[in-house]
Amino acid sequence: MLVYLAEYLTQFYSGFNVFSYVTFRAILGLMTALVFCLWWGPKMIRRLQTLQIGQVVRSDGPESHFSKSGTPTMGGILILAGIFISVLLWGDLGSRYVWVVLFVLASFGLIGFIDDYRKVVRKDTKGLIARWKYILQSLAAIIIAFYLYASADTVGETQLVVPFFKDIMPQMGAFFIVLAYFTIVGSSNAVNLTDGLDGLAIMPTVMVAAAFALIAYLSGHVQFANYLHIPYLPGAGELVIVCTAIVGAGLGFLWFNTYPAQVFMGDVGSLALGAALGAIAVLVRQEILLVIMGGVFVMETVSVILQVGSYKLRGQRIFRMAPIHHHYELKGWPEPRVIVRFWIISLFLVMLGLATLKLR
């Protein structure tokens, strides 16, 4: 929004031209989201406590989690508010890239809000029925997938980038819709499954978003894109502001979500952030890279699939409890140790993912 005001004011004072640079606006976007969350966080936590919107802890979970019962949840509203305010202030609102991610955040955030509301306000322990949750997620993802496919202006927008192979970038055709759908829905649910310990999901989300900020910047510049053999995507640079807003809001939320957490993000946060990462990966054509950089999310999801599959087929469990972070808790690892070690794994995987841009 302010980019248009700055553009107008440039005719009176050339210094306002600095707002035309994506990098400058990205820094302001990160700082805006961070400061907003740090400022509004305590107020929101007190409000959630007043409304008695507290976390419901599973009776079959680790005993160490019983003390978390009643901790304010639905803190994802704080994250989303920080992102929206930051992007609307510093982003180019004429960019379809920006609006695609905002739509994904809003739609999946609404789904998560309904789920959380039913759990903590209406005291329905099941929340939104899984079938309806999946249907709503699918509807939102299909809308975005069809829109991106129909509005693609360049060849690069529907190519698939294969890490480590610079000459393999097949045209997806209509299969682009299928890949986009599974990337967005899969990423949304993967982050949701990871959000089981204090700060466990938000820090890897911040790391992946920061990496995508760099990738979006490179994809939006023809020289860098050609040098790295990745699709050149005109206008993709505006995603940098979105990504840095996610980083800023995520760090601001982590201030209150670090162990022992004062607030949880709830499904309103985890479903929205996961879907946003998936949408950004689709927009910059790096779906496979998301699997690498978001390896912690993948690991958590696979552990649940293996656990359920093994129990149904053999009547035996592979892990003491799934998702896998609970397995390590039941092995005796203190919660902070599990969290930090998963962060370290995530950092390694993000660096590995970025390295693939050159190792081709």
UniProtKB/Swiss-Prot annotation:
Swiss-Prot/TrEMBL catalytic activity: UDP-N-acetyl-alpha-D-muramoyl-L-alanyl-gamma-D-glutamyl-meso-2,6-diaminopimeloyl-D-alanyl-D-alanine + di-trans,octa-cis-undecaprenyl phosphate = di-trans,octa-cis-undecaprenyl diphospho-N-acetyl-alpha-D-muramoyl-L-alanyl-D-glutamyl-meso-2,6-diaminopimeloyl-D-alanyl-D-alanine + UMP
Pfam families xref list: Glycos_transf_4 (PF00953), MraY_sig1 (PF10555)
Domain of life: Bacteria
GO biological process assignments: cell division; cell wall organization; peptidoglycan biosynthetic process; regulation of cell shape
Cofactor(s) named in the record: Mg(2+)
Transmembrane spans: 21-41, 74-94, 97-117, 135-155, 168-188, 199-219, 236-256, 263-283, 288-308, 338-358
Bilayer disposition of the protein: Multi-pass membrane protein
Pathway(s) it belongs to: Cell wall biogenesis; peptidoglycan biosynthesis
Family stated for the protein in its record: Belongs to the glycosyltransferase 4 family. MraY subfamily.
Name of protein: Phospho-N-acetylmuramoyl-pentapeptide-transferase
Organism: Shewanella violacea (strain JCM 10179 / CIP 106290 / LMG 19151 / DSS12)
